[in-house]
């Protein structure tokens, strides 16, 4: 029997398109909200990713790439209002994308958390959001290419050989300065 999107969301226990929150462990006055990205997040996403790519910790993302894949992104933002370029008056502190690659395969991409918010479970919650969405779409294999495999192992992923991934995933890699000598580690989780 066909289940509507709403029924599938309810079965998953979470509606991926509505925000959720966590409290920062060492600062109970700070709350981080997780939601899908909005058009006004693009500049903040670009700045976050650029900071990591300049440090060699992440592959760069162009503005056009962020716009094209905006629907893939989850955002983590503080509940504390700030002034500046932030989308809704809150500070964007992390982001992550789930990119569907093939029939039963998706990639977690562009996982980044601002340095002051690192090691506060924000990255773990962003991954969890992506895994819930993958489950909603009945995708059971989720991989990532990462410079931080231990973080993904902590979150239930296993290291795999890059040769286990389909050739299609390398289409993004052609424009990378490190292609074909990729120094990232491939990790995968099966739901």
Which residue ranges define each predicted feature?
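Conserved GNAT acetyl-CoA-binding A-motif
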Residues: 134-147
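A short beta-loop-alpha structural element at the N-terminal edge
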Residues: 31-45
């Amino acid at each position: 029997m066909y289940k509507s999107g709403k029924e599938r969301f309810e079965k998953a226990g979470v509606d991926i398109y509505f925000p959720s929150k966590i409290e920062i462990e060492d600062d109970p006055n700070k709350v981080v909200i997780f939601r899908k990205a909005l058009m006004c997040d693009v500049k903040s996403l670009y700045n976050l990713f650029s900071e990591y790519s300049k440090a060699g910790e992440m592959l760069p993302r162009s503005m056009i790439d962020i716009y094209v894949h905006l629907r893939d992104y989850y955002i983590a933002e503080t509940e504390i209002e700030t002034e500046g370029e932030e989308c809704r008056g809150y500070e964007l502190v992390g982001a992550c994308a789930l990119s569907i690659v093939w029939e039963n395969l998706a990639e977690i991409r562009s996982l980044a958390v601002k340095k002051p918010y690192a090691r506060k479970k924000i990255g773990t919650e962003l991954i969890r959001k992506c895994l819930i969405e993958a489950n909603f779409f009945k995708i059971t294999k989720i991989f990532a290419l990462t410079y931080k495999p231990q973080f993904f192992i902590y979150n239930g992923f296993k290291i795999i050989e890059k040769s286990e991934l389909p050739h299609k995933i390398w289409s993004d890699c052609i424009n990378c300065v490190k292609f074909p000598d990729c120094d990232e580690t491939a990790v995968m989780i099966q739901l």
